[in-house]
Amino acid sequence: MRLFLSLPVLVVVLAMVLEGPAPAQAAPEISSTLERIPDKLKEFGNTLENKARAAIESIKQSDLPAKTRNWFSETFNKVEQLKTTFS
């Protein structure tokens, strides 16, 4: 029974493989690919720029820089106090 079912499946798969890719799946020509490279690079650059600007704005809007600056100041003051204590 298994052999009876597997043979038609094998024939269908073999037919699909031998048929080749569909026209929409065929590889594009190299010249058209090369022509699109500058557009793709510009699109990538614009996307990267927008994401970087958004990240910088997010950092500016948050209180992270102030907290970091305060933490460093406090830590530096503690180190200075330790120096004066043990000197």
From Swiss-Prot:
Query: Is the keyword Signal in the record?
Result: yes
Protein function: Inhibitor of lipoprotein binding to the low density lipoprotein (LDL) receptor, LDL receptor-related protein, and very low density lipoprotein (VLDL) receptor. Associates with high density lipoproteins (HDL) and the triacylglycerol-rich lipoproteins in the plasma and makes up about 10% of the protein of the VLDL and 2% of that of HDL. Appears to interfere directly with fatty acid uptake and is also the major plasma inhibitor of cholesteryl ester transfer protein (CETP). Binds free fatty acids and reduces their intracellular esterification.
Question: Pfam families given for it?
Answer: ApoC-I
Any one GO BP annotation for this protein: negative regulation of very-low-density lipoprotein particle clearance
* Alphabetized InterPro entries for the sequence: ApoC-1_sf, ApoC-I
Q: GO CC annotations?
A: high-density lipoprotein particle; very-low-density lipoprotein particle
In Swiss-Prot or TrEMBL terms, this protein is called Apolipoprotein C-I
Q: Tell me the keywords, alphabetical order.
A: Lipid transport, Secreted, Signal, Transport, VLDL
Q: Which cysteines are joined by disulfide bonds?
A: none
List the Gene Ontology MF annotations in alphabetical order: fatty acid binding; phospholipase inhibitor activity
Compartments, as annotated in UniProt: Secreted
Please give the organism: Zalophus californianus (California sealion)
Where would you say this protein principally sits, based on its record?
Answer: secreted
**Residues of the signal peptide:** 1-26
Q: Which family does it belong to?
A: Belongs to the apolipoprotein C1 family.
